[in-house]
């Protein structure tokens, strides 16, 4: 006996994905087929050229930091005793209380292209009897990111920003040749076909669960490349990052099957890289260390790493010159930049080992051909979190730093700065051993496909508010050193001593549930086909601490929940009356998709208009879930043309709006995209 495979639900949900994201534009019917003796093979190729344009004006009052307002001139600034503007002058201006989230917004003006990309995608499939090999690779070049001019330069030096300066950032978003899938497989019919067995080994994508549009569900096995996903003409098979693993599926009975995987490779989500239009954090992501994390506690502009190295080279030269400089003056100079920026260390990656999962599948024909899934996974976070190391402002630490500088005059680099005790440091980390327990089903109700899933995570790491982390790392250490005792208790993270490494996250249990409805209307209203999809989901955070105990990180929150009896001190730290809400213990939202099809509209051209609407209804999920932000909405309108399964063209418009206060970081980044494709 063989396991019965019910095709309707799977194909309907797959069609829902295609309808929703419109990523699989061209089929593989034109693939080149060939034979090498008993080996059968196919080779597919798709080439794409596309561009995106920003169509909305930047929101200077809500999304741009106060220090980056155009009326300020920061040229010739130095923290060594050259304060250009007072805190009161900066405080009086419109804008955000943080300048750690506005770089990408400043780089692109209304009407600018944000991407000009050409790329190729190739797939090779070989099969011999019951064995096979599959490989997929791609290459791309984004002219805008590699060669484009930008409206915003470094506020101090005037240097033009280069989003491709860092090698990893360049590979992720600027240009690259990469191997995606690369695995071998074998299929066996055990016991005369009663127990079919499939095995795959290599870099591959494993898709579990029933979610279509709402992420962070059961399907967390493979990370996503958000840079490629947001590029013109993106396809899902380009965006899901294959990981090295062994996967197997075994049919136990006619209705019961088991799947399992073991990963020997770990890869993270590639978040939008600083400098790309979709990035909402200036220091997280590849190359973010160049921007530093701006503390903003004084009247200072954004201070990047190159400028800090330049200034410390000057200080080191003064020390090494032998000139007599009072110790008090040297200490003041040693404090100038550590009180204004936090340096960013290299990422701390988890182990490749210890990641595995099991799925038990059951097909119930007596329940309307329903398929059930039961899941368990142990995995390491693919989503970035921020931890840190506190500064040490003790006299001994400062004198030690000055000695190191004097001994290395002429050779000041990033590694040396990171070794200095007086700087606080931020670091992207990926905590290990998250346990996921899941349940899913899919069935049909007439012509409507229904899929649902529940994912319960044990010990999921959730980001503590970054302001609490920064406050614990710097101003609290000024209090510990007796320099500013009035700063004591400024952060909700208490007990942090000089030089301590601080986990920037807490582990809590979370539960996420969602349901998806996909309906195929067929020919209707003059259309050859109409597909509609609706997905609704919610997230519960179990035992989440109250706001007065510990606040978790969400978008647009630039204030501390520390000692409420020090409002004057809070204001002195450039942390004003911003009132955006913090994450909540429950949040939910929904997504709607409609896709119409007009076959052979003219001269053999097929046309497919589509609409995607997203609404985060209530509550805010903490980072790094990146799911729901109360009141946030978006609508995407698209029009796709296809000719003879070879040529394709797509035009889309994306509009972002809504949100409470300034929590919707994309609210002023509407854009249009266009691409053409050719496939053989």
Residue ranges, per PLM feature:
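Short loop/turn motifs that connect adjacent beta-strands in outer-membrane beta-barrel proteins
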Residues: 30-43, 55-58, 124-133, 146, ...
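Membrane-embedded beta-strand positions of outer-membrane beta-barrel proteins
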Residues: 43-45, 135, 199-201, 248, ...
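Transmembrane beta-strands of outer-membrane beta-barrel pores
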Residues: 49-55, 139-143, 203-207, 262-268, ...
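Flexible, surface-exposed loop regions and adjacent strand-edge segments
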Residues: 60-67, 150-157, 215-221, 275-283, ...
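Extracellular loop and loop/strand-boundary signature of outer-membrane beta-barrel proteins
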Residues: 105-110, 166-171, 231-234, 276, ...
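Detector for outer-membrane/organellar transmembrane beta-barrel domains
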Residues: 113-115, 377-380, 384, 451, ...
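Outer membrane beta-barrel
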Residues: 127-286, 589, 618-619, 628-633, ...
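Outer-membrane beta-barrel "beta-signal"
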Residues: 668-680
